[in-house]
């Protein structure tokens, strides 16, 4: 009975925690970027996420040390003094596992995303369509009696603690899943290390697969499984659990004689909803427009070859896209109102840019640099279209206080990074199409300079390391990242105040603004009282 209660509590933890999550990730190979870096991203979209950011320090551990295994371990715990003080918040300690002799420093927020070796990752949780009897059977087989102990949070934490390459990170997570079982809803992860970009998927139980994308390729995932093929003879580019095919055969989910190609995504996590497919279409079309992909297609290529080299700024704009210039442009939907509010929570289309994004993370990893300075991530709070991003490294000595200040469930705070960005974002909504131009005019020139300066800082730090001055190199990137982040925060807060004054009531400088012509047309045709008066 006690075991049943514990398992029930785990199930409630996992599925209630994940219910509001819906993230988008992209991955870009080194030959597809302007600076020959690998790039992986994560738009962490959630209504409840703990936005605080910590650096978990690297350590050496005595022989026989163990590590706590916690379900939902990133749910309002305090990691400010971890591991001396273990506060897992709403997480549940379920077991212990042997600890590695050495662990690496990494960034820990709602998810963990890059370590000091330059291994980075994001995640996107699967949807699962149960509209047919076979799909209902599959779901029940995987999740109906699932006693696994591994979820996305502890899997990524452990991988980042221990892995020095993307391939190693995936193998670590795969080994954990095979030994302890995957409890979460399914996940797609983009994992990179400067040389390679991998896509890993965890389907539940001990089932998983991964594929390396070509170095000149671009990938996107938007809340559904994407790996639709495994070459079982290509061990250089594919990894998978031993039973990835046999489980489907033994349980009547797929047959060698069916004539249907083996597709883990179609078998273990089927979903064809526009909620996911439209974002896939949009991201792929932005980088390879000449493919003329069908916006209503059910399946898209796992990757495409971008028609130009991509920069961090290009990727940021993809992360902030809301179908501009297409028939699905959110700023031209009725829900956008008279001033084109692309962040209205009630839009019928789901775009990559989203009002409830907790943070956007863009890992920008150059393999030619030494580990302490190549582990660069560009980080910003809130919707990508209306936020700034700033360079951070997990080798930094400390983060500014505003990264660990405040909560979504507490009062607005001007000393909180997330609240400051949310202030600008929410202010922009009063007259979005005008305000967002001001945001971009304020942000983008600064970012253009910052991209150049950051690369110079990395090169200088790399030279210091080459000369045996690693401490000085880390001091350099730490000071640069810290002061840059503080400057952004202070300037953004002041900018938000100016924006608020400019766009009070949706006016501009206290002058009313004419609504869009298309909006006027809609209003002319709308009934005076759409809800009958009683």
Segments predicted by a language model, with ranges:
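Sec-dependent signal peptide recognition
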Residues: 2-9
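A contiguous strand-loop segment
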Residues: 23-152, 172-306
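Short, well-structured alpha-helical segments that form the helix of a local strand-helix-strand
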Residues: 169-178, 316-319, 474
């Amino acid at each position: 009975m006690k075991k049943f209660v514990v398992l029930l509590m785990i199930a409630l933890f996992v599925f209630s925690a994940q219910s509001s999550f819906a993230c988008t990730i992209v991955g870009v190979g080194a030959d597809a970027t302007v600076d020959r870096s690998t790039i992986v991203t994560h738009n962490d979209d959630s209504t409840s996420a703990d936005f605080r950011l910590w650096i978990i320090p690297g350590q050496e551990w005595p022989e026989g040390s163990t590590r706590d295994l916690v379900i939902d371990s990133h749910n309002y715990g305090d990691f400010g003094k971890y591991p001396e003080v273990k506060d897992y918040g709403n997480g549940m300690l379920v077991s212990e596992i042997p600890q590695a002799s050495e662990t690496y420093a990494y960034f820990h927020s709602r998810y963990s995303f890059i370590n000091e070796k330059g291994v980075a990752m994001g995640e996107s949780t699967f949807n699962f369509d149960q509209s047919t009897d076979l799909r209902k059977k599959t779901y029940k087989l995987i999740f109906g009696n699932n006693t696994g102990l591994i979820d996305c949070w502890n899997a990524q934490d452990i991988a980042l603690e221990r892995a020095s390459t993307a391939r190693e990170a995936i193998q670590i997570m795969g080994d954990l899943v095979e030994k302890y079982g995957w409890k979460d809803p399914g996940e797609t992860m983009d994992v990179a290390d400067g040389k390679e970009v991998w896509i890993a998927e965890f389907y539940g139980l001990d089932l998983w697969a991964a594929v390396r994308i070509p170095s000149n390729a671009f990938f996107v995932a938007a809340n559904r499984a994407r790996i639709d093929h495994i070459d079982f003879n290509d061990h250089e580019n594919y990894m998978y659990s031993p039973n990835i095919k046999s489980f489907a055969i033994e349980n009547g989910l797929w047959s060698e004689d069916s004539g249907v190609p083996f597709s883990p995504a179609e078998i273990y996590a089927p979903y064809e909803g526009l909620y996911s497919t439209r974002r896939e279409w949009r991201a792929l079309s932005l980088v390879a427009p000449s493919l003329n992909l069908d916006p209503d297609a059910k399946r898209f290529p796992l990757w495409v070859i971008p028609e130009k080299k991509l920069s961090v700024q290009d990727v940021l704009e993809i992360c902030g896209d809301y179908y501009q210039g297409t028939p699905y442009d959110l700023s031209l939907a009725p829900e956008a109102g008279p001033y084109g509010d692309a962040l209205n929570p009630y839009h019928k289309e789901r775009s990559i840019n989203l009002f409830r994004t907790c943070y956007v993370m863009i890992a920008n990893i150059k393999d030619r640099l030494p580990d302490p300075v190549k582990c660069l991530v560009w980080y910003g709070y809130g919707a990508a279209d209306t936020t700034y991003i700033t360079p951070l490294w997990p080798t930094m000595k400390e983060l500014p206080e505003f990264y660990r200040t405040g909560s979504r469930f507490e009062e607005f705070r001007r000393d909180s990074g997330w609240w400051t960005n949310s202030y600008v974002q929410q202010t922009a909504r009063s007259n979005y199409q005008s305000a967002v131009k001001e945001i971009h005019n304020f942000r983008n020139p600064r970012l253009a300079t910052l991209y150049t300066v950051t690369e110079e800082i990395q090169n200088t730090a790399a030279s210091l390391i080459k000369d045996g001055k690693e401490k000085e190199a880390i001091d350099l990137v730490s000071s640069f990242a810290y002061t840059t982040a503080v400057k952004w925060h202070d300037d953004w807060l002041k900018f938000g105040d100016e924006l608020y004054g400019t766009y009070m009531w949706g006016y501009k400088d206290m002058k009313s603004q004419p609504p869009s012509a298309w909006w006027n047309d809609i209003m002319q045709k709308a009934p005076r009282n759409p809800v009958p008066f009683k």
